[in-house]
Amino acid sequence: MSHDHADIVNALIPMVVEQSNRGERSFDIYSRLLRERIIFVTGQVEDHMASVICAQLLFLEAENPKKDIFLYINSPGGVVTAGLAIHDTMQYIRPKVGTLCIGQAASMGSFLLAAGEPGMRVATTNSRIMIHQPSGGAQGMAADIEIQAREILRMRKRLNALYAKYTNQPIEEIEKAMDRDNFLEADEAKAFGLIDKVFDKRPVASEEKE
């Protein structure tokens, strides 16, 4: 991302001002939502983004290891190793990590969505989820291409096993479903086991109804 583009993006992020007995404090909207234990996974999954998300997960665990965390996902996917870094941190920390798809969760985005705490994996009504096998652009000498191809196959086997675990689908069904780009609507993703619920409105707690 160029500096000019980054400046434009930063300028578009709203600021929130809060009053306290110490005076006014301002936060960008994402920092304010982090206080509510909400983390956004937005855009390409890559190493820098993964580092920021892992740091936020670890910070929230240190702040309160017993309180749930929620990842809001709107991502076309990205680098497998970056996604696995986020995944492993989600599994490593003590708080339960719920996942919610808004917009899309494709490729590694769908993997992170499925890896959320069972019963806490949600998609909004008009979101879409896409699963497929990992790909790689092998180049160089024949021996190097062969090494890269073996690594892609090994990574594919590992991801298929994890998808099978999170969806409770047979590994054969996962391999078949992920052979090519496979786009699912929210209800289809629920039936497949990638998510647990489809929401069009935030659930209202019983005490709020009274």
Curated annotation (Swiss-Prot):
It is an enzyme of class 3 (hydrolase). GO terms for biological process: protein quality control for misfolded or incompletely synthesized proteins. It catalyses: Hydrolysis of proteins to small peptides in the presence of ATP and magnesium. alpha-casein is the usual test substrate. In the absence of ATP, only oligopeptides shorter than five residues are hydrolyzed (such as succinyl-Leu-Tyr-|-NHMec, and Leu-Tyr-Leu-|-Tyr-Trp, in which cleavage of the -Tyr-|-Leu- and -Tyr-|-Trp bonds also occurs). Its EC number is 3.4.21.92. It is found in: Cytoplasm. One of its GO terms (molecular function) is ATPase binding. Keywords: Cytoplasm, Hydrolase, Protease, Serine protease. Coiled coil: none annotated. Its main location: cytoplasm. The active site is at S107, H132. One of its GO terms (cellular component) is cytoplasm. The keyword Membrane does not apply. Pfam families: CLP_protease. Belongs to the peptidase S14 family. Fourteen ClpP subunits assemble into 2 heptameric rings which stack back to back to give a disk-like structure with a central cavity, resembling the structure of eukaryotic proteasomes. Cleaves peptides in various proteins in a process that requires ATP hydrolysis. Has a chymotrypsin-like activity. Plays a major role in the degradation of misfolded proteins. This is ATP-dependent Clp protease proteolytic subunit. It comes from Zymomonas mobilis subsp. mobilis (strain ATCC 31821 / ZM4 / CP4).
